[in-house]
């Protein structure tokens, strides 16, 4: 069951997604940076969602439960799906948005690069899956992040390229990629005109 709402005047949305594995509610406000600390039951995922909100300057609330006693994959992927649905709702017709965003983020020995397009077309190119990244961060791996971003892209209609230019330690790799994603998204959702950024007349 999914419950969705979008206000008529503000770029906000609330989405609830319930399955046999997870129950997730995401509230997203693209124009207010006031956020609520995330509560997913997974400490490192909460940390990354907080980084996403802060570096993306997003109003974000995520409340989630899931079958963490099995493995965090379902919860992490489903939070990405629900966040993507919320972004799609909040953007509405996407008129006036900058559309494109990119960011480099260093974290000690790590350097991440993210480029995205709010095109309405879903695609994820995730380069780090071909690299040797060491270990995990609080039970979260870069493969979990890939599934989070894949779910997000598929349900938000976003083309996303993620590159790891340097780094191997999982905590730094994941955090740098999330922060680069947040900063690229921050630029792409900005309203910079009254026109649609497409020669087709549709995003």
UniProtKB/Swiss-Prot annotation:
SUPFAM superfamilies in alphabetical order: Ribosomal protein S5 domain 2-like (SSF54211)
Record-linked PROSITE patterns: IGP_DEHYDRATASE_1, IGP_DEHYDRATASE_2
Keywords: Amino-acid biosynthesis, Cytoplasm, Histidine biosynthesis, Lyase
One biological process term in Gene Ontology: L-histidine biosynthetic process
Class of the enzyme per the UniProt entry, highest EC level: lyase
Catalytic activity: D-erythro-1-(imidazol-4-yl)glycerol 3-phosphate = 3-(imidazol-4-yl)-2-oxopropyl phosphate + H2O
Location relative to the cell: Cytoplasm
Residues of the signal peptide: none
GO molecular function: imidazoleglycerol-phosphate dehydratase activity
Pathway listed: Amino-acid biosynthesis; L-histidine biosynthesis; L-histidine from 5-phospho-alpha-D-ribose 1-diphosphate: step 6/9
Any Pfam family the entry gives: IGPD
GO cellular component: a single term: cytoplasm
UniProt entry tagged with the keyword Lyase: yes
Domain of life: Bacteria
EC assignment: 4.2.1.19
PANTHER family in alphabetical order: IMIDAZOLEGLYCEROL-PHOSPHATE DEHYDRATASE, IMIDAZOLEGLYCEROL-PHOSPHATE DEHYDRATASE HIS7
Family according to the record: Belongs to the imidazoleglycerol-phosphate dehydratase family.
Name of the protein: Imidazoleglycerol-phosphate dehydratase
Top-level taxonomy: Bacteria, Thermotogati, Deinococcota, Deinococci, Deinococcales
């Amino acid at each position: 069951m999914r419950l969705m709402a979008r206000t008529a005047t503000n770029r906000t949305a609330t989405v609830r997604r319930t399955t046999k594995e997870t129950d997730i509610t995401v509230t997203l406000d693209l124009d207010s940076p006031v956020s609520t600390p995330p509560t997913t039951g997974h400490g490192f995922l909460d940390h990354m969602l907080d980084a996403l909100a802060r570096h993306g300057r997003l109003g974000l609330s995520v409340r989630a439960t899931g079958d963490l006693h099995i493995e965090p994959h379902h919860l992490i992927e489903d939070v990405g799906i629900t966040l993507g649905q919320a972004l799609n709702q909040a953007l509405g017709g996407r008129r006036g948005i900058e559309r494109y965003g990119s960011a480099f983020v260093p974290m000690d020995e790590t350097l991440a690069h993210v480029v995205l397009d709010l095109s309405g077309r879903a695609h994820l190119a995730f380069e780090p899956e071909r690299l040797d990244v060491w270990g995990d961060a609080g039970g979260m791996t870069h493969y979990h992040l890939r599934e989070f971003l894949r779910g997000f892209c598929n349900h938000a209609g976003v083309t996303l390229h993620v590159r790891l230019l340097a780094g191997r330690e999982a905590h730094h790799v994941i955090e740098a990629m999330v922060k680069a994603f947040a900063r690229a998204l921050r630029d792409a959702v900005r309203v910079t005109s009254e026109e649609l950024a497409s020669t087709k007349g549709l995003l």
